[in-house]
């Protein structure tokens, strides 16, 4: 089979190498999945480039650990073979999910993974759509509903609104009749307005932490500013929720959050993702035409190195999706 291997950190177009390798064999409670579609995510960028540097403490200081040699954390595909203890699926089942709690490896034609990493794919969504949902949609839902405790008619800002999480977060916020401002690069603003944002800002031209607008809830997909700046634009009892970003800013929040509780009624949170939680609920919204998948692509399997670089450059509109075995 073909798979993308990485041995050293670096430029995705250089270090992601397409190789021929043996098809893996499922052990115990693993299943072998024929990968039909995968996506590009923040972990894929970090595993490939070693950036932000703090992620090297997780993935390997000088090079990715051997088990991370094949990146890829979201998958939609077909069960091809069962390990001896696998009981949740049968051969031929269509499955999908965020596999990051159990490992990586979806930048390949076949993937072996613990059966608990996946769920049955609904019949009414394509493999490409299914691959785009698990990580981004659950992050958006957990960030807004579970952590941010969104309420009707709130004023919300999404920093990084033009990406995969941002596009799902917009749609979920609109279910609560929220007024939603999106922040991203100027090249994405027209598409973001078409998706339904009430207001869009080019972060290169306007610093939303210095204008007169204030917000009940901020969902931060970038975490690229100081907490003190967000404090200025949060309304009393407002909530700031980070889903990831620059390691220095994330560490700042971990250390400062207890201090902020002492003198402010504004709340600062980080999402600790529960992978694949509420996929059935998210599918019900999709089925009722309440949300849709904003797909950047799909691109062909040979475009993965280019697509990882596209993600890192922040040029994607929605979720970058790769067709593997169409």
Residue positions per predicted region:
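Glycine-rich beta-strand-centered segment in the early N-terminal region that forms part
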Residues: 22-39, 53-102
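Glycine-rich phosphate-binding loop and adjacent beta-alpha segment
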Residues: 224-288, 324-326
């Amino acid at each position: 089979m073909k798979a993308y291997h990485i041995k050293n950190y670096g430029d995705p177009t250089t270090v992601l190498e397409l190789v021929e390798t043996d098809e893996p064999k499922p052990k115990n409670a693993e299943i072998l999945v024929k990968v039909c579609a995968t996506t590009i995510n923040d972990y894929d960028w970090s595993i490939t480039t070693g950036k932000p540097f703090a992620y090297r403490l997780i993935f390997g200081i000088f090079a990715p650990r051997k088990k991370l040699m094949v990146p890829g954390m979201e998958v939609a595909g077909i069960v091809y073979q069962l390990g001896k203890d696998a009981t949740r699926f049968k051969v031929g089942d269509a499955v999908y999910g965020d596999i990051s709690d159990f490992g990586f490896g979806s930048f390949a034609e076949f993937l072996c993974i613990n059966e608990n990493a996946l769920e049955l794919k609904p019949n009414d969504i394509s493999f490409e759509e299914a691959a785009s949902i698990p990580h981004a949609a659950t992050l958006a839902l957990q960030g807004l509903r579970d952590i941010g405790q969104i309420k009707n008619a709130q004023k919300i800002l999404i920093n990084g609104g033009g990406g995969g999480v941002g596009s799902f977060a917009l749609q979920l916020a609109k279910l609560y009749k929220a007024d939603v401002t999106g922040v991203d690069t100027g090249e994405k603003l027209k598409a973001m307005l078409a998706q339904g944002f009430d207001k869009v800002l080019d972060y290169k031209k306007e610093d939303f932490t210095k204008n007169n607008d204030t917000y009940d809830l901020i969902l931060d997909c970038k975490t690229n500013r100081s907490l003190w700046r967000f404090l200025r634009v949060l309304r009393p009892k407002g909530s700031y929720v980070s889903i990831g970003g620059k390691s220095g800013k994330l560490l700042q929040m971990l250390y400062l959050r207890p201090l902020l509780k002492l003198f402010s009624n504004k709340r600062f949170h980080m999402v600790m993702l529960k992978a694949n939680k509420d996929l059935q609920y998210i599918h019900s919204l999709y089925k009722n035409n309440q949300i849709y998948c904003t797909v950047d692509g799909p691109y062909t399997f040979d475009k993965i190195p280019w697509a990882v670089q596209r993600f890192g450059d922040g040029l994607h509109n929605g979720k970058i999706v790769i067709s593997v075995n169409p």
